[in-house]
Amino acid sequence: VAKAVWFKEVASEKLLEQLDEKWIDEALEMTGTATMRRRRLPAEQVVWLVLGMSLYRELTIPEVVAKLGLSLPGERGLTVAPSALPQARARLGEEPMAWLFDKCSEKWALESARKHAWRGLSVFGIDGTCLRVPDSKANRAHFGGQSSSEEKGESGYPLARLVTVMALRSHLLLGARFGSYDTGETTLAKELWPMIPDNSLCIVDRGFLSAPGLLPYSLQGANRHWLTRAKKNTAMRVIRKLGKGDELVELNISPEARANDPSLPEHWTARAVRYQRRGFQ
């Protein structure tokens, strides 16, 4: 436990050290939040406060202020009341933080992926999960949740759907999208595919094996590849054998998918590699 706490402390400090202060100014200017500087709490200080609150969740807000060494003067040099800090965070809104996240993730994840390339390809992965959010009427209405039988009712907490694209060698996020529990992972992933650069390989699980996501990703760029395990019931027709356990195959695209995107063809091709690990059937 002590080692985990130490690692978290070092990682948090390292992240804050790598954060360019100019990006915070840009985030405020690009989202029209710079006018907050005229208030008692400078907007850039509030951004640092929100970052600290996310990294040091076990600390109170005043403790975060002290740990980061933030200077939060009030009017006429008076100290800002602790109750003003949550209000300042709410005034800041999500736009500057979202802009800052996109800026940091794009720079750090792309640099890392290029540095740890495999056979000249930057390696990424897309996957999804569900997160519990605070139980409130607003969150239940917005996110929904898992429902079961009438006797058991709904899940204990509202659930948000999260899909991310990650540089796999470093685990740095390139992008993230949230949605309601009823929103499918492939739907959220549509906004993430364009973030992946050329000369890349994206590894996904079987749930993402669909033409609407994979086909545009591979065709609307240069040297883009994807890799996934196929489901046992995946229908494919062999076009040509390339070697032992190596085939060029054709897969059908459903009428529903083509109705949603008329640009999709009736079929698409992929390379199928078949193998069996020792001890597995």
Regions found by a protein language model. Give the residues of each.
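Single, function-defining residue in the core of a domain
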Residues: 1-64, 89-92, 99-103, 119-122, ...
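DNA-recognition alpha helix
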Residues: 60-76
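Acidic/polar active-site rim loop that often engages polyanionic ligands
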Residues: 69, 84, 197
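A short structural micro-motif
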Residues: 71, 92-95, 107
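Major-groove recognition helix of helix-turn-helix-like DNA-binding domains
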Residues: 75-94
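Secondary-structure boundary/capping residues
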Residues: 77, 94-97, 113, 198
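Short helix-terminating capping/connector loops at secondary-structure junctions
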Residues: 78, 117-118
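Long amphipathic N-terminal alpha/beta scaffold segment
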Residues: 109-117, 133
